[in-house]
């Protein structure tokens, strides 16, 4: 689980910072579109802040991977990755959006979801610890 938390921390922190700093570039690479409305720019930056927060949470939990809190974080990451795959697939298939990073992002989120499942399954087999 520690490796999953470190990899997720690195990826989500980098993408979060990119969305905060250059959201139009990220969206162009991901979806092949632009952020035409100011509201879309705000939503992209809020998304960047959320991803940065996820990255920080994963980084801080990396040394406490046997705790219930870490298991809860990985469960939330599983939900996020499955939702990301679903939304990105809809963007491609339903909305005909395409950027150079779209399918790599789908595959990355799918792989991270499988990794989350594996970690949660393994965690189930071993006892969890509680802080305090």
Label the predicted regions.
Residues 3, 15-42:
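Membrane-helix boundary elements
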Residues 111-132:
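Membrane-water interface at the C-terminal end of transmembrane alpha helices
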Residues 20, 59, 89, 114-120:
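Membrane-embedded alpha-helical segments of multi-pass transporters/permeases
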Residues 1-12:
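Cytosolic juxtamembrane helix and N-cap/initiation of the first transmembrane helix
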Residues 58-71, 92-94:
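Juxtamembrane helix-break-helix junctions at the cytosolic face
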Residues 86-104, 120-121:
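Membrane-helix boundary connector in multi-pass membrane proteins
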Residues 33-41, 72-73, 96-107:
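Non-cytosolic membrane-interface motifs at loop->transmembrane helix junctions
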Residues 14-19, 39-62, 75-86:
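Core segments of alpha-helical transmembrane spans in multipass integral membrane proteins
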């Amino acid at each position: 689980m520690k490796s999953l938390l470190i990899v997720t921390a690195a990826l989500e922190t980098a993408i979060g910072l990119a969305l905060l700093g250059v959201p139009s570039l990220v969206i162009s690479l991901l979806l092949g579109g632009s952020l035409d409305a100011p509201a879309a720019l705000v939503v992209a930056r809020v998304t960047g802040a959320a991803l940065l927060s996820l990255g920080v949470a994963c980084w801080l939990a990396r040394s406490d991977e046997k705790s219930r809190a870490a298991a809860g974080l990985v469960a939330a990451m599983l939900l996020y990755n499955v939702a990301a795959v679903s939304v990105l697939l809809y963007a491609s298939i339903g909305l005909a959006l395409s950027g150079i990073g779209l399918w790599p992002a789908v595959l990355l989120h799918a792989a991270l979801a499988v990794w989350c499942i594996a970690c949660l399954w393994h965690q189930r087999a071993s006892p969890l610890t509680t802080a305090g």
